[in-house]
């Protein structure tokens, strides 16, 4: 017997829990942590710690240079005590800064390129079990070298260049472990001809 269900998926249907109270126990520039109390008909009263992202979406940018290379940031990440390879990424630093604006700024700051075109190709929830954080991913094309690169924490980061094949191989063998970078690299590797859209920068 088939286990398929035919109810249309609706992410906004009525919630099975009711929020009763919320208390911010830690407040930071990028996120707050709230202790939130819920009530459920099935399991009763319970509490959860929820990370609430501030300043809009996080943003990641992947691009290809004229010679077909992907610029990645090699940097030391203190929370995981290891060096990582990641696409340029960041957050809004002022009210009203759009994800597109963040993508433009971070790509220039971190790898030293301006992009003639920036196209959003993906948006995902980082971890819906405890966080409200979304990440928007952009593809940068029409690159022009400008002054920049290693803007933040320069002593702990450098720009490296890889072919899509090399980057994908490092995804497969576990060298690249950063989630946003894995998603972006696989998209470029498997669908290189479907990255550029109509979102231009003036």
Regions picked out by a protein language model, each given a short descriptive name:
Residues 22-62, 66:
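Acidic, metal-coordinating catalytic segment for phosphate/diphosphate chemistry
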Residues 35-37, 63, 139-141, 161-163:
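Short, well-ordered beta-strand micro-motif
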Residues 71, 86, 106-108, 119-120, ...:
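Conserved beta-strand segments that form the floor/walls of ligand-binding pockets within enzyme
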Residues 1-17, 83, 153-202:
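Nudix hydrolase/Nudix homology domain
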């Amino acid at each position: 017997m088939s286990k398929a269900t035919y109810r249309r998926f609706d992410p906004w249907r009525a919630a099975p829990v009711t929020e009763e109270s919320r208390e911010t126990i830690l407040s930071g520039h990028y996120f707050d942590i709230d202790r939130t109390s819920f009530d459920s008909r099935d399991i009763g009263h319970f509490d959860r710690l929820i990370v609430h992202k501030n300043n809009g979406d996080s943003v990641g940018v992947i691009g290809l240079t004229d010679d077909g290379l992907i610029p990645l940031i090699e940097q030391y990440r203190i929370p995981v005590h290891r060096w990582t390879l990641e696409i340029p990424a960041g957050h809004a630093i002022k009210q009203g800064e759009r994800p597109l604006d963040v993508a433009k700024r971070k790509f220039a700051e971190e790898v030293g390129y301006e992009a003639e075109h920036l196209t959003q190709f993906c948006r995902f929830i980082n971890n819906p079990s405890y966080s409200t954080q979304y990440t928007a991913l952009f593809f940068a094309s029409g690159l022009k070298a400008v002054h920049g690169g290693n803007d933040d924490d320069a002593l702990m980061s450098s720009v490296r260049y890889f072919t899509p094949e090399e980057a994908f191989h490092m995804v497969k063998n576990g060298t690249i472990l950063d989630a946003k970078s894995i998603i972006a690299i696989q998209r470029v590797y498997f669908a290189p001809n479907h990255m550029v859209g109509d979102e231009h920068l003036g």
